[in-house]
Amino acid sequence: MKKSYSEVIGKCFEELEEIIKRGKLKIENNKIELLYFNRKIKIDLKLKDFEGVEDYKEKIIILHYLCKFKEGKNDELITYKNLPDGNFYFPSIYSRVYLPLIEKYKNEPLKFIEKGLEIGGEKISEFSIKFPVFSDIFFIFELIPEDEEFPADLKILFNRKGSEIFEIEDLAIIGEIIVSKMV
């Protein structure tokens, strides 16, 4: 598995080099610096090394972002189901992204907020956290706690700009990354 991630990362770096040659991305001292989950990270293009990121999936997401970045802003909120083939992929996304958080925090919404803040999220309503994935892409997770009448649920929204850059699987992986930091 590690080998296939390494191959994908290698191909992404090749694509990134082409983008840099065309002058579409600015670099300084062979490094790219950007915000990722409110943390400043650096990518050394010469060494093909990430400062501050160890996980292969996260490295691939960052490289996909850099390779497919588009100017402009689109903060219209959408869900996974709004994406092409979103309804088809939703059961898989639900089990990978929604269920782990629902099961962990269904009766503990304050701990949900506490953990979200701890990993760099911003509280935007009673049980909602906004996660700035990149400076122009964010996810919102809203927990609906369990009560006497209804089971717990989770709403996940993200700005449309994310769908303009990422494929549905990348967006699902971003959701999984957030979940892995929350559980």
Question: What residue ranges belong to the model's regions?
Answer:
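Short Lys/Arg-enriched alpha/beta "domain-start" segment
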Residues: 1-33, 58-119
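Extracellular secretory-pathway ectodomains and N-terminal mature segments of eukaryotic proteins
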Residues: 3-7, 34, 49-52, 145
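Generic recognition of long tandem-repeat/solenoid scaffolds
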Residues: 27-36, 43, 47-52, 127-132, ...
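Intrinsically disordered, low-complexity regulatory segments enriched in Ser/Thr/Pro
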Residues: 39-60, 144-169
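Extended, well-ordered protein cores
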Residues: 67-81, 90, 132-138, 142, ...
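Short helix-capping/linker segments at secondary-structure and domain boundaries
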Residues: 69-74, 149, 181-183
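Conserved binding-pocket/active-site segment within a compact domain
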Residues: 107-166
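Long, compositionally biased interface segments
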Residues: 162-183
